[in-house]
Amino acid sequence: MVADTVYADNTLVAKDVAFTLPGLEFMTADVMAMGNMTVPLVGLLENMELTITKIGVDMGLSRLGRLEKQNLEFRWVQNVVKSDGTQGTEGCKAFVRVMPAALPELGVEIGSATEAEGTYTVTRMQIYANGAEYMCVDRLSQILRVNGKDYMSAINNLL
């Protein structure tokens, strides 16, 4: 990754921070198939958690620490090697709706930078790579779309 920025409700709150977007971890069920077999239950997700690690205590950290729902936008630029061997840059974005799960502790030490790691529960996440949607998950609206395929439409049509 070359660079990144983070926006909270359309306000720039951080540059060049470390963040971890959640993956999709499905709940499972055990079935009998020549013994036990664990199968994923597509549509039932475990908790989705986002972490942001920021250096320093400033208004950006204060804005990220609001005890209410927030809409976060992550933008990052990455280098890619194309099939012909040339290099280029690609822009990526993630739009994430969160609720704070934990406010960061602050360790202060002379001669060291203060590092704060905020943790958030994700209710919606939409990721784009080079302008194409990779994933959209909205837990409260029952949306689960990965690489353009809607995995909840068949379930929602039966409800």
Per-range role (PLM):
Residues 1-59, 97-108, 146-158:
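Solvent-exposed edge beta-strands and adjacent loop segments
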Residues 1-2, 69, 121-122:
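A short, compositionally biased
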Residues 13-18, 86-98, 136-138:
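Short amphipathic beta-strand/extended segments with alternating polar/hydrophobic composition
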Residues 42-46, 66-68, 86-90, 110-114:
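A generic structural micro-feature
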Residues 49-53, 71-75, 93-95, 117-121:
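Beta-strand secondary-structure signal
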Residues 54-58, 76-82, 96-102, 122-127:
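Beta-strand elements of well-folded, non-transmembrane domains
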Residues 64-94:
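Short, acidic/charged, Gly/Pro-enriched secondary-structure junctions
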Residues 99-159:
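Mixed-charge, glycine-accented linear interaction segment located at domain edges/termini
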